[in-house]
Amino acid sequence: MRWSNFFLKKSCYFSINRHISITDSDSDHNANAMRQSKELLERINKVVRHIEQAIDREMSLDELATIACFSPFHFQRIFKEIIGETPKQFIKRLRLEEAARLIAFHPDRNILSVAFQVGFQSLEVFSRAFKDYYSISPDTYRKSSESERFRITQMPYTQLQTGEKPVLDVVSLKPMQDFDDLSIEIVTRPPIQCVYLKTTLQSPKMVDESFKSIKQWSHIRDLPGSDATPFGVIKDYPIFTALDKCRFFTCIAVDNPAKISGIVNHFAISSKKYATFTIEGGIADIVEAAKFLVHAWMPGSGYEIVLEPVILIPLKDPTATPFKENSWQTHIPIQPEGRLY
Protein backbone atom coordinates (compact mmCIF):
# COMPACT_ATOMS: atom_id res chain seq x y z
CA MET A 1 0.00 0.00 0.00
CA ARG A 2 1.30 3.48 -0.85
CA TRP A 3 0.28 5.77 1.99
CA SER A 4 0.74 8.85 -0.18
CA ASN A 5 -2.29 7.73 -2.21
CA PHE A 6 -4.47 8.81 0.72
CA PHE A 7 -3.32 12.38 0.39
CA LEU A 8 -4.17 13.33 -3.18
CA LYS A 9 -7.27 15.45 -2.58
CA LYS A 10 -8.15 18.57 -4.51
CA SER A 11 -8.68 21.23 -1.84
CA CYS A 12 -5.17 22.04 -0.61
CA TYR A 13 -1.68 20.73 -0.19
CA PHE A 14 0.66 19.73 2.56
CA SER A 15 4.07 18.25 1.87
CA ILE A 16 6.63 16.12 3.44
CA ASN A 17 7.66 15.71 -0.18
CA ARG A 18 3.98 14.97 -0.90
CA HIS A 19 0.74 16.87 -1.65
CA ILE A 20 -2.00 15.90 0.75
CA SER A 21 -5.46 17.17 1.66
CA ILE A 22 -7.02 18.40 4.88
CA THR A 23 -10.60 18.38 3.57
CA ASP A 24 -13.36 16.04 4.70
CA SER A 25 -13.67 12.82 2.72
CA ASP A 26 -16.70 12.05 0.59
CA SER A 27 -17.34 8.59 2.01
CA ASP A 28 -16.93 6.64 5.22
CA HIS A 29 -14.20 4.58 3.57
CA ASN A 30 -12.24 7.63 2.52
CA ALA A 31 -12.82 9.27 5.90
CA ASN A 32 -11.39 6.23 7.65
CA ALA A 33 -8.44 6.17 5.27
CA MET A 34 -7.81 9.86 5.91
CA ARG A 35 -7.88 9.34 9.67
CA GLN A 36 -5.37 6.53 9.32
CA SER A 37 -3.11 8.64 7.10
CA LYS A 38 -3.21 11.56 9.56
CA GLU A 39 -2.30 9.21 12.39
CA LEU A 40 0.66 7.94 10.39
CA LEU A 41 1.79 11.48 9.69
CA GLU A 42 1.46 12.37 13.36
CA ARG A 43 3.69 9.46 14.31
CA ILE A 44 6.31 10.20 11.65
CA ASN A 45 6.25 13.92 12.46
CA LYS A 46 6.97 13.03 16.08
CA VAL A 47 10.02 11.05 14.98
CA VAL A 48 11.25 13.85 12.70
CA ARG A 49 11.01 16.35 15.57
CA HIS A 50 12.94 13.95 17.80
CA ILE A 51 15.66 13.54 15.17
CA GLU A 52 16.02 17.31 14.77
CA GLN A 53 16.33 17.79 18.53
CA ALA A 54 18.77 14.90 19.02
CA ILE A 55 20.90 15.37 15.91
CA ASP A 56 24.07 15.54 18.04
CA ARG A 57 23.78 11.98 19.37
CA GLU A 58 23.39 8.43 18.15
CA MET A 59 19.86 7.23 17.41
CA SER A 60 19.07 3.58 16.78
CA LEU A 61 16.34 2.29 14.49
CA ASP A 62 14.70 0.60 17.49
CA GLU A 63 14.61 3.92 19.38
CA LEU A 64 12.94 5.74 16.49
CA ALA A 65 10.51 2.90 15.81
CA THR A 66 9.48 2.91 19.48
CA ILE A 67 8.69 6.63 19.31
CA ALA A 68 6.46 5.96 16.29
CA CYS A 69 4.89 2.86 17.93
CA PHE A 70 5.84 0.64 14.99
CA SER A 71 8.00 -2.41 14.60
CA PRO A 72 11.42 -1.45 13.14
CA PHE A 73 10.49 -3.10 9.82
CA HIS A 74 7.18 -1.29 9.39
CA PHE A 75 8.58 1.99 10.71
CA GLN A 76 11.41 2.05 8.19
CA ARG A 77 9.04 1.29 5.30
CA ILE A 78 6.46 3.92 6.28
CA PHE A 79 9.11 6.55 7.08
CA LYS A 80 10.65 6.18 3.63
CA GLU A 81 7.23 6.28 1.95
CA ILE A 82 6.32 9.58 3.63
CA ILE A 83 9.70 11.32 3.87
CA GLY A 84 11.29 9.94 0.71
CA GLU A 85 14.43 8.73 2.51
CA THR A 86 15.19 5.97 4.99
CA PRO A 87 15.72 7.12 8.59
CA LYS A 88 19.45 6.52 8.20
CA GLN A 89 19.63 8.54 4.97
CA PHE A 90 17.56 11.36 6.48
CA ILE A 91 19.73 11.62 9.60
CA LYS A 92 22.97 11.45 7.63
CA ARG A 93 21.85 14.17 5.21
CA LEU A 94 20.75 16.52 7.99
CA ARG A 95 24.03 16.02 9.84
CA LEU A 96 26.26 16.55 6.83
CA GLU A 97 24.33 19.58 5.57
CA GLU A 98 24.52 21.10 9.05
CA ALA A 99 28.27 20.41 9.09
CA ALA A 100 28.71 22.04 5.67
CA ARG A 101 26.86 25.14 6.89
CA LEU A 102 28.91 25.35 10.08
CA ILE A 103 32.19 25.07 8.21
CA ALA A 104 31.14 27.55 5.51
CA PHE A 105 29.91 30.23 7.93
CA HIS A 106 32.57 29.60 10.58
CA PRO A 107 35.73 28.40 8.76
CA ASP A 108 37.89 28.99 11.86
CA ARG A 109 36.03 26.35 13.84
CA ASN A 110 37.82 23.14 14.66
CA ILE A 111 36.64 20.31 12.38
CA LEU A 112 36.45 17.89 15.30
CA SER A 113 34.10 20.20 17.22
CA VAL A 114 31.89 20.41 14.13
CA ALA A 115 31.84 16.61 13.91
CA PHE A 116 30.77 16.30 17.55
CA GLN A 117 28.13 19.02 17.21
CA VAL A 118 26.37 17.20 14.37
CA GLY A 119 26.44 13.78 16.02
CA PHE A 120 29.59 12.02 14.81
CA GLN A 121 31.67 10.25 17.44
CA SER A 122 35.09 10.61 15.82
CA LEU A 123 36.89 12.78 13.29
CA GLU A 124 37.70 9.73 11.17
CA VAL A 125 34.07 8.64 10.84
CA PHE A 126 32.93 12.20 10.12
CA SER A 127 35.64 12.85 7.51
CA ARG A 128 34.85 9.60 5.72
CA ALA A 129 31.11 10.32 5.68
CA PHE A 130 31.66 13.91 4.51
CA LYS A 131 33.95 12.80 1.69
CA ASP A 132 31.59 10.00 0.64
CA TYR A 133 28.74 12.51 0.43
CA TYR A 134 30.47 15.58 -1.03
CA SER A 135 33.48 13.92 -2.75
CA ILE A 136 35.86 16.18 -0.81
CA SER A 137 37.36 16.21 2.68
CA PRO A 138 36.02 18.65 5.29
CA ASP A 139 39.36 20.44 5.49
CA THR A 140 39.60 20.89 1.71
CA TYR A 141 36.00 22.10 1.67
CA ARG A 142 36.84 24.67 4.33
CA LYS A 143 39.77 26.00 2.28
CA SER A 144 37.70 26.26 -0.92
CA SER A 145 36.31 29.52 -2.29
CA GLU A 146 32.70 30.39 -1.60
CA SER A 147 31.57 29.61 -5.15
CA GLU A 148 33.38 26.28 -5.01
CA ARG A 149 31.75 25.41 -1.68
CA PHE A 150 28.33 26.13 -3.15
CA ARG A 151 29.09 23.86 -6.09
CA ILE A 152 30.29 21.12 -3.73
CA THR A 153 27.25 21.21 -1.45
CA GLN A 154 24.88 20.98 -4.40
CA MET A 155 26.80 18.14 -6.04
CA PRO A 156 24.95 15.25 -4.32
CA TYR A 157 21.75 16.52 -5.98
CA THR A 158 22.96 17.75 -9.37
CA GLN A 159 24.75 14.45 -9.98
CA LEU A 160 21.54 12.49 -9.38
CA GLN A 161 19.14 14.82 -11.15
CA THR A 162 18.16 13.96 -14.71
CA GLY A 163 15.41 16.52 -15.21
CA GLU A 164 14.84 20.00 -13.85
CA LYS A 165 17.53 21.02 -11.35
CA PRO A 166 16.19 20.93 -7.79
CA VAL A 167 18.96 23.22 -6.51
CA LEU A 168 19.40 26.95 -6.41
CA ASP A 169 21.47 28.21 -9.36
CA VAL A 170 24.08 30.23 -7.45
CA VAL A 171 25.93 31.12 -10.65
CA SER A 172 23.05 33.30 -11.85
CA LEU A 173 22.66 35.22 -8.58
CA LYS A 174 22.89 39.01 -8.84
CA PRO A 175 26.20 40.78 -8.10
CA MET A 176 26.37 42.02 -4.53
CA GLN A 177 26.69 45.64 -5.65
CA ASP A 178 23.05 45.42 -6.80
CA PHE A 179 22.09 45.50 -3.10
CA ASP A 180 24.08 48.56 -2.03
CA ASP A 181 20.83 50.32 -1.10
CA LEU A 182 19.50 47.37 0.93
CA SER A 183 18.46 48.63 4.37
CA ILE A 184 19.50 46.25 7.16
CA GLU A 185 18.35 46.68 10.76
CA ILE A 186 18.95 44.76 13.98
CA VAL A 187 15.76 43.80 15.79
CA THR A 188 14.81 41.58 18.71
CA ARG A 189 11.63 39.62 18.14
CA PRO A 190 9.50 38.36 21.04
CA PRO A 191 8.75 34.64 21.42
CA ILE A 192 6.02 33.25 19.17
CA GLN A 193 3.72 30.25 19.50
CA CYS A 194 2.42 29.04 16.16
CA VAL A 195 0.87 26.16 14.29
CA TYR A 196 2.30 25.19 10.93
CA LEU A 197 2.18 23.01 7.86
CA LYS A 198 5.40 21.67 6.41
CA THR A 199 6.20 21.89 2.72
CA THR A 200 9.39 22.36 0.69
CA LEU A 201 10.77 25.11 -1.53
CA GLN A 202 10.67 22.90 -4.62
CA SER A 203 7.50 24.52 -5.98
CA PRO A 204 6.29 28.10 -5.34
CA LYS A 205 2.78 26.84 -6.09
CA MET A 206 3.02 24.30 -3.27
CA VAL A 207 4.12 27.08 -0.91
CA ASP A 208 1.19 29.26 -2.01
CA GLU A 209 -1.26 26.41 -1.43
CA SER A 210 0.28 25.63 1.95
CA PHE A 211 -0.26 29.24 3.08
CA LYS A 212 -3.93 28.90 2.10
CA SER A 213 -4.22 25.55 3.86
CA ILE A 214 -2.85 26.67 7.24
CA LYS A 215 -5.07 29.75 7.14
CA GLN A 216 -8.09 27.59 6.36
CA TRP A 217 -7.18 25.06 9.06
CA SER A 218 -6.85 27.69 11.80
CA HIS A 219 -9.94 29.61 10.66
CA ILE A 220 -12.17 26.52 10.72
CA ARG A 221 -11.08 25.80 14.29
CA ASP A 222 -11.48 29.44 15.33
CA LEU A 223 -8.12 29.41 17.11
CA PRO A 224 -7.21 32.52 19.13
CA GLY A 225 -5.08 34.61 16.78
CA SER A 226 -6.19 32.69 13.69
CA ASP A 227 -7.10 35.94 11.91
CA ALA A 228 -3.41 36.87 11.81
CA THR A 229 -1.56 36.86 8.49
CA PRO A 230 0.42 33.64 7.90
CA PHE A 231 4.21 33.86 7.80
CA GLY A 232 6.99 31.56 6.63
CA VAL A 233 9.94 29.84 8.28
CA ILE A 234 12.88 28.48 6.27
CA LYS A 235 14.27 25.47 8.15
CA ASP A 236 17.09 24.62 5.72
CA TYR A 237 19.42 26.99 3.87
CA PRO A 238 18.65 26.67 0.12
CA ILE A 239 22.30 27.14 -0.86
CA PHE A 240 23.22 23.96 1.02
CA THR A 241 20.06 21.88 0.55
CA ALA A 242 18.25 20.82 -2.61
CA LEU A 243 14.97 22.69 -2.94
CA ASP A 244 12.91 19.49 -2.86
CA LYS A 245 14.47 18.74 0.56
CA CYS A 246 14.53 22.33 1.83
CA ARG A 247 11.90 22.42 4.58
CA PHE A 248 9.57 25.42 4.69
CA PHE A 249 6.92 26.01 7.36
CA THR A 250 3.80 28.05 6.65
CA CYS A 251 2.77 29.33 10.06
CA ILE A 252 -0.02 31.06 11.93
CA ALA A 253 0.82 32.69 15.26
CA VAL A 254 -1.75 31.69 17.88
CA ASP A 255 -2.27 32.84 21.45
CA ASN A 256 -2.95 29.40 22.87
CA PRO A 257 -2.23 26.45 20.56
CA ALA A 258 -4.99 23.87 20.72
CA LYS A 259 -4.33 20.15 20.74
CA ILE A 260 -3.15 19.36 17.26
CA SER A 261 -2.47 16.19 15.36
CA GLY A 262 -1.71 14.74 11.97
CA ILE A 263 -0.55 17.17 9.33
CA VAL A 264 -0.47 20.27 11.54
CA ASN A 265 2.25 20.80 14.13
CA HIS A 266 3.05 23.23 16.92
CA PHE A 267 6.21 25.35 16.73
CA ALA A 268 7.65 27.64 19.42
CA ILE A 269 10.08 30.36 18.35
CA SER A 270 12.05 31.82 21.25
CA SER A 271 12.99 35.48 21.50
CA LYS A 272 16.00 36.18 19.29
CA LYS A 273 18.02 38.95 17.74
CA TYR A 274 17.79 39.20 13.94
CA ALA A 275 19.35 41.08 11.07
CA THR A 276 16.33 42.20 9.07
CA PHE A 277 15.79 43.44 5.52
CA THR A 278 12.86 43.63 3.11
CA ILE A 279 13.09 42.17 -0.38
CA GLU A 280 10.56 41.58 -3.14
CA GLY A 281 10.54 38.31 -5.06
CA GLY A 282 11.07 34.59 -4.69
CA ILE A 283 13.58 32.45 -2.86
CA ALA A 284 16.45 33.31 -5.22
CA ASP A 285 15.94 37.03 -4.52
CA ILE A 286 15.94 36.39 -0.77
CA VAL A 287 19.14 34.35 -0.99
CA GLU A 288 20.82 37.04 -3.11
CA ALA A 289 20.04 39.67 -0.50
CA ALA A 290 21.15 37.33 2.31
CA LYS A 291 24.51 36.86 0.58
CA PHE A 292 24.94 40.63 0.54
CA LEU A 293 24.18 40.72 4.27
CA VAL A 294 26.75 38.02 5.00
CA HIS A 295 29.57 39.44 2.89
CA ALA A 296 29.01 43.19 2.87
CA TRP A 297 27.21 43.98 6.12
CA MET A 298 28.27 41.24 8.55
CA PRO A 299 32.05 41.93 8.56
CA GLY A 300 32.68 44.68 11.07
CA SER A 301 29.12 44.54 12.44
CA GLY A 302 30.13 42.64 15.55
CA TYR A 303 27.64 39.88 14.74
CA GLU A 304 27.65 36.47 13.14
CA ILE A 305 24.89 34.25 11.74
CA VAL A 306 23.23 31.70 14.00
CA LEU A 307 22.31 28.57 12.07
CA GLU A 308 18.66 28.62 13.06
CA PRO A 309 15.44 29.06 11.05
CA VAL A 310 14.94 32.22 9.01
CA ILE A 311 11.59 34.01 9.43
CA LEU A 312 9.77 35.53 6.45
CA ILE A 313 7.03 38.06 7.23
CA PRO A 314 4.94 38.85 4.11
CA LEU A 315 3.96 42.45 3.47
CA LYS A 316 1.00 41.26 1.38
CA ASP A 317 -1.47 38.51 2.22
CA PRO A 318 0.32 35.28 1.12
CA THR A 319 -3.02 33.53 0.65
CA ALA A 320 -3.86 36.02 -2.12
CA THR A 321 -0.41 36.99 -3.45
CA PRO A 322 1.92 34.47 -5.14
CA PHE A 323 5.19 33.87 -3.30
CA LYS A 324 7.33 35.35 -6.09
CA GLU A 325 5.22 38.52 -6.24
CA ASN A 326 5.25 39.25 -2.53
CA SER A 327 7.61 41.41 -0.48
CA TRP A 328 9.24 39.65 2.44
CA GLN A 329 10.56 41.11 5.66
CA THR A 330 13.40 38.65 6.13
CA HIS A 331 14.74 37.91 9.62
CA ILE A 332 18.12 36.14 9.80
CA PRO A 333 19.16 35.02 13.31
CA ILE A 334 22.39 36.59 14.59
CA GLN A 335 24.45 36.63 17.76
CA PRO A 336 27.47 38.60 19.02
CA GLU A 337 30.59 37.57 17.13
CA GLY A 338 32.76 35.00 18.86
CA ARG A 339 30.05 33.78 21.22
CA LEU A 340 30.50 30.16 22.25
CA TYR A 341 28.00 27.62 20.87
Summary of predicted features, one role per range:
Residues S15, S21-H29:
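Compositionally biased, intrinsically disordered low-complexity segments enriched
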Residues Q89, E97, A104-F105, L112, ...:
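A solvent-exposed interaction/effector surface
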Residues E39-V47, I83, K92-R95, P107:
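N-terminal positioning helix adjacent to the helix-turn-helix/winged-helix DNA-binding module
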Residues I51, F75, L293:
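Conserved hydrophobic/aromatic pocket- or pore-lining residues that grip, position, or stack substrates
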